[in-house]
A protein has these predicted regions:
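Intrinsically disordered, low-complexity segments enriched in small residues
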Residues: 1-81, 154-159
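Residue-level recognition of conserved structural "scaffold" positions that shape functional pockets
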Residues: 17, 42, 55, 61, ...
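Short alpha-helical segments and helix-capping/turn motifs at coil-helix boundaries
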Residues: 50-55, 91-93, 99-103
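Solvent-exposed loop and beta-edge segments used for protein-protein assembly and interaction
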Residues: 60-62, 99-101, 163
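N-terminal targeting and processing segments
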Residues: 70-71, 91-95, 127
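Extracellular/virion structural assembly segments
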Residues: 74, 82-84, 101, 106-107
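Short, polar loop/linker segments at the starts of domains and inter-domain junctions
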Residues: 77-91
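Extended charged/polar low-complexity repeat regions
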Residues: 88, 103-408
Length: 408
């Protein structure tokens, strides 16, 4: 979604970025900067949310490359999606999901945004004017010659075009396609076969207009069933995503304490199954390795491209680059899991945040620059910086549909 786009109900899109849409090669719309309004380092005053619009951890050059980026928002939607592998509040582009209802298709990202389409028959397509997005159901070898996507459709492998159980999304006749399928799984011993397909579709890959593919590999069985554990990009490189459970992280923390001769800190073996940011299975991404590169098969990195550290409550605490140097750190509220109260780039001052009882940011503290305070009234938000300069935003709408109609 782009800021300012209109929905089918007449309101503007408020959870999106200025140029990134669902279907863009760099990821799903960021969902953390409604209306494009941010303040400071940064805060979205319309939602009263601490946001980080996008930080890229992996981006190697090449056709249809695998780009691993993170976005954060402290905003809590009324219909939260499950907590992803980066912990509460954080999102990755691959967390897109299509729900199949009786008469409705709901395309959702991990931030709780939803885009509704009518039921599609095989070979039919739906178009969202607000997103400039097509959703097409497979089941035909060719689209009508006059269709804007006819040429792009032919770039798909025949098995994808002919499968009525797959859906494909794109925001441009130039591509790429986002492939929405299902995770193959190992059936239970007493399960009646063939097992029915799930009532949802998840992102399984991308295909560009030249037929190059990026594939997301999901586990078929075990404790990580359905989770992405590998990616093959358009250059043929393979990345391995190392996942951990809360119990595994707790055991690792105990072993580190023993080897270091220190008293083990409180690190529970399980996490609550639900947070303000949605259901939580406790599975987290620990590291990403490059395991195959056709251009340099004998010269693979001896360390992960990125590594993540976690708090005992399953919150993203630190990011380490390929040299094992910590580049980011995050601190969260003791009471509200996933609510960020501070963050820091290595070598820079720590930026801190305070919230009110409704979970809205009221103060942003920067020891080496401008600090900000936020005052929330009905249809009015006042932002004051540490030089006593003031900006007043007059708004309309509520919650995620709030938009600025006048500035002072």
């Amino acid at each position: 979604a782009r800021q300012g786009d209109m929905t089918q109900y007449g309101g503007s899109i408020v959870q999106g970025s200025a140029g990134v849409r669902i279907g863009a090669p760099t990821g799903v719309a960021c969902s953390v900067c409604p209306g494009g309004v941010t303040s400071g380092h940064p805060v979205n005053p319309l939602l009263g949310a601490k946001v980080l619009p996008g930080e890229t951890d992996i981006a190697l050059p090449g056709p249809l490359p695998f780009i691993l980026s993170r976005t954060y928002s402290s905003y809590r939607t009324k219909t939260p999606a499950p907590v992803g592998s980066l912990g509460p509040g954080w999102k990755m582009p691959a967390d897109i999901r299509l729900q199949l209802r009786d008469n409705t298709l709901i395309l959702s990202d991990n931030g709780g945004r939803s885009l509704y389409f009518e039921h599609l028959f095989p070979g039919e397509d739906g178009y969202s004017r607000s997103e400039s997005l097509w959703l097409v159901r497979g089941g035909v070898a060719k689209l009508d010659e006059g269709h804007r996507l006819a040429a792009l459709w032919q770039a798909l492998p025949e098995e994808l075009r002919l499968s009525p159980h797959r859906y494909l999304a794109t925001n441009s006749p130039q591509g790429p396609w986002w492939l929405l399928g299902w995770c193959e799984r190992v059936p239970e011993a007493d399960e009646v076969l063939p097992a029915p397909l799930p009532p949802y579709r998840v992102l399984t890959g991308l295909v560009d207009r030249f037929g190059r593919t990026q594939t997301f590999h999901r586990e078929a069985a075990g404790e990580f069933s359905g989770e992405i554990t590998g990616v093959t990009d358009g250059a043929g490189r393979h990345f391995r995503l190392v996942l951990t459970t809360q119990a595994q992280r707790a055991e690792e923390a105990r072993q580190q304490a023993i080897s270091g001769g220190t008293e083990p800190s409180a690190f529970p073996d399980t996490l609550p199954g639900y947070t303000e940011y949605g259901r939580d299975n406790g599975i987290r991404l620990s590291a990403v390795w490059l395991t195959h590169d056709p251009e340099y098969p004998e010269n693979l990195p001896a360390a992960p491209l990125v590594r993540y550290g976690w708090t005992p409550r399953g919150e993203l605490a630190a990011v380490y680059d390929r040299s094992n140097t910590q580049v980011r750190s995050f601190t969260y509220d003791d009471k509200y899991r996933g609510r960020m109260v501070a963050h820091r780039h290595t070598g820079r001052p720590e930026i801190r945040y305070r919230y009110d009882s409704d979970g809205r940011v009221t103060e942003q503290l920067n020891p080496a620059g401008l600090s900000y305070t936020y005052q929330y009234e009905k249809d009015r938000i006042t932002i004051t910086d540490s030089l006593d300069r003031r900006e007043v935003l007059h708004t309309q709408g509520e919650a995620g549909l709030k938009r600025v109609v006048k500035k002072e």
